C-alpha cells in the first residue's frame, strides 16, 4: 500500500488559514459556524495533540474552537505540586505567562500546602498531569462531557483502550439528535479481547463504532513513532492517519505541521493492532534493557524475536497486513526504546515499581501494555484456535508459538515468574529462528478472520 506524503514546508499564517478553510469546506461549515475540535481524554499524547492544534489554529477564533475534556476532581498531591512549582520557576517565559494570567499565586499556595490543585485546573494553564516537565500552551478545558462533545465536528480520542468504550457509550447519549455524524480520530494504542459468542480482538475504533453507531468511515486511527513531549518540543516527527479515503486525505493535510509529517494509509486494522502489540513487547524490552545493563546484543536479540511474533499475530488477523517496515517499524522501535511501557518494564526490573501498584502510574498514566498482554495471550491461547503445527504435526494454539508473549503473560498477569524470567525465555536453546515464525505467518495457515469480526 502506498503512503501519500503531505507537504512539509514551514507554513506561513496565510497558508495555515487556507488549510483551515479547506477542512471547513470539506465538513460543510457555514461562514458563521466555527469548526469545533474536541479532545476526549487528557493523557500525554492526547493533551499534546490538542495543544498542537490550538497553537496552529487557535488564533482563527471565528473559524475554529479547540477544547479538551478530562474528568474533574482529580487532586494533585503535595509532592507533585512542589515539582510543578520548580518547573514553573525554572522557566522565565512560563513564569511571566502565569503572572499575566493571574495564575501564579495558586501554585505558590499549593507549594506551601495552603491549597489543593486539580488536574483540570492546571491543564487550563498548560500542565498535563502525566507530563509536568513539558508545559503546553493554555487550553480550554471542559469537565462536563455533554458540554464538551454534543456539538463537536472532530473528536480526538485520547483515552486508553480500557476506557474508550465506556466513555463513548456515554457520549452516544448526547449525539442521538445529531443530523451529521462527527469525524473521530483515535490515538488509542491498545486492544481488548472478548470471548463470546466467539474469541475476537476489539480495537478502539471498533469500540467507538459499537458504542456510538458512528459509521466506520468516520472513525480513523492516527499513530506513529512519536514521544509526546518530543513532538511538542518540535522534534521532527511523522505519523500515519488510517481509515477511509474520504476523511484521511483532507485530515492528513489539516493535521500536518512543519515538524509533524502526516501520511495517509488505508490499512487501519494493522496499524491499530500494531499500536497495541508494540506496547506489549515494549514492557519486555524495558526489562531486558535493565537486566542486561543495556546490552545492545541482548536488546537486538529480543527485537528480532518480538517483531517476528508481531508479524505472526498480525497475519492471524489480516490476510495481507501492512508490512512491519517504514513508519510501522519505526513506531515499534521508538516505543521499545523510550515509551512509557518500556519505562514501566525498566522500573519493574529494577524493583522500583511492583505489580501490586497496578497499571495506572502517577505521573505516567495508564500502562496500556499490561491489559494488551492479557488480551492478546488469552485470545490466542483459546483451544478453539488450535491448528496443526506445520513441522511438528501436533495441535498448537497460536499463543504457544509466541514464547515472548507467553512469558510476559506469566510475569505480568499470572505472576508465576519474576522479571528475570524474560531472559530465560530469550535464551531458551529450543527457541526457533524468528524467520521460521515469519514463514508460518506468510503461509496464512493460521489466518482466522473472525478474530476481528470478519467473515471467513
Swiss-Prot record:
Entry annotated with the keyword Thylakoid: no
Catalytic activity reported: sn-glycerol 3-phosphate + NAD(+) = dihydroxyacetone phosphate + NADH + H(+)
Classification via Pfam families: NAD_Gly3P_dh_C, NAD_Gly3P_dh_N
Active site location: 278
GO cellular component, one term: cytoplasm
Positions bound to substrate: 189, 340-341
InterPro entries xref list: 6-PGluconate_DH-like_C_sf (IPR008927), 6PGD_dom2 (IPR013328), G3P_DH_NAD-dep (IPR006168), G3P_DH_NAD-dep_C (IPR006109), G3P_DH_NAD-dep_N (IPR011128), NAD(P)-bd_dom_sf (IPR036291)
Name of this protein: Glycerol-3-phosphate dehydrogenase [NAD(+)] At3g07690, cytosolic
